[in-house]
């Protein structure tokens, strides 16, 4: 996206962005503030859809996402296990499932080395109450007790997962679930539609239930981040082009008919959206006070470093302190 938007005129007039991907676009001054266009043509857009950064509207969000728990109701019931609300309970439940002989690797999350693994660290660190950078600076602030506790929990969960967990992204763990190998899973809310459709084993589909994200370490906010998807407008395009693009996309991002027709395809931020069963994870995350993924200029670099540096700790080749020091 960056090269396409850097061209003058840019190759696209709009770019779909999220919490993390908007930061490089802003850092390089590639997208334009939308305040005037919102005032003029944003009648159907709700205030909650406006992504405001440094006092300027830089994006219009249309859907929300988060990672939360999925569980097999039948497996938990058979073993008398309550629905886990904390990661400590997820570990205990997974150990009980393994001990019963029902499943050898009862837990799954997207631990693929790189972006996915780093996202799991981000979620767990936030759940422990961590702050990624020292106040008012770009200096990392993860090599501490909260960082170590985060890594130790990720390690415990990885030991209850398929041994190939470092290659497993969201699609791979979805396949594990649909194959009946997993009873507890942390996965994106946006993936719930394909897990609850009519295409897989009907018994697994029927037993697949959704709940909110887990907390960790005695914390009271979820070990999860809230995400938004929305549209931004390219700076390197004529004003008339930006205006026409905004009008078209603002119509789409406030279209009540679309929201009604596609109510179970996403958690829409559009007025008139009625949440269905597939939205429960995001709705619960919001109720529990989940924090948004940090929109900080330096967060991209940290995310990239985390995805590679904590692999050796999970493989038992490095201490938690050394892994965090390497970030």
Annotate each language-model stretch with its function.
Residues 1-45, 74-85, 176, 183-184, ...:
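Extracytoplasmic "Venus flytrap"/periplasmic binding protein-like
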Residues 53, 58-62, 67, 91-139, ...:
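Extracytoplasmic/periplasmic solute-binding protein
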Residues 32-46, 106-112, 128-149, 197-208, ...:
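Short, solvent-exposed loop/beta-turn-alpha elements that line the ligand-binding surface or hinge
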Residues 1, 90, 97, 175-180:
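Hydrophobic residues within well-ordered alpha-helices
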Residues 3-6, 10-15, 41-75, 105, ...:
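A structural signal for short loop-to-beta-strand junctions that line the ligand-binding cleft
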Residues 190-205, 216-308:
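C-terminal lobe and pocket-closing loops
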Residues 93-96, 136-166:
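Glycine-centered hinge/linker elements that transmit conformational signals in sensory
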């Amino acid at each position: 996206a960056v090269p396409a938007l850097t061209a003058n005129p840019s190759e696209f007039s709009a770019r779909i962005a999220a919490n993390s991907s908007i930061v490089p676009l802003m850092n390089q001054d590639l997208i334009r503030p939308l305040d005037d266009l919102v005032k003029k043509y944003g009648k159907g857009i709700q205030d909650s859809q406006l992504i405001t950064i440094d006092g300027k509207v830089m994006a219009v969000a249309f859907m929300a996402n988060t990672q939360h728990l999925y569980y097999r109701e039948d497996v938990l019931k058979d073993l008398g296990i309550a629905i886990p609300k904390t990661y400590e309970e997820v570990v205990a439940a997974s150990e009980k499932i393994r001990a019963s002989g029902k499943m050898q690797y009862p837990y799954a999350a997207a631990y693929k080395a790189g972006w996915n693994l780093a996202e799991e660290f981000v979620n767990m660190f936030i759940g422990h109450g961590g702050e990624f950078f020292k106040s008012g600076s770009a200096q990392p602030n993860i090599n501490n007790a909260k960082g170590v506790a985060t890594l130790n929990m990720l390690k415990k969960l990885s030991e209850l997962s398929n041994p190939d967990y470092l290659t497993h992204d969201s699609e791979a763990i979805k396949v594990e679930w649909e194959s009946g190998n997993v009873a507890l899973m942390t996965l994106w809310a946006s993936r719930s539609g394909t897990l609850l459709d009519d295409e897989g084993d009907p018994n697994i589909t029927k037993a697949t239930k959704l709940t909110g994200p887990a907390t960790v370490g005695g914390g009271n906010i979820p070990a999860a981040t809230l995400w938004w998807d929305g549209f931004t407008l390219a700076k390197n395009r004529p004003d008339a082009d930006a205006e026409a693009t905004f009008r078209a996309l603002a119509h789409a991002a406030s279209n009540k008919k679309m929201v009604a027709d596609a109510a179970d395809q996403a958690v829409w931020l559009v007025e008139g959206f009625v949440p269905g069963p597939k939205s429960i994870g995001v709705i619960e995350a919001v109720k529990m006070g989940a924090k948004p993924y940090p929109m900080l200029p330096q967060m991209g670099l940290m995310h990239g470093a985390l995805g590679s540096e904590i692999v050796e700790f999970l493989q038992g080749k490095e201490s938690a302190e050394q892994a965090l020091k390497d970030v």
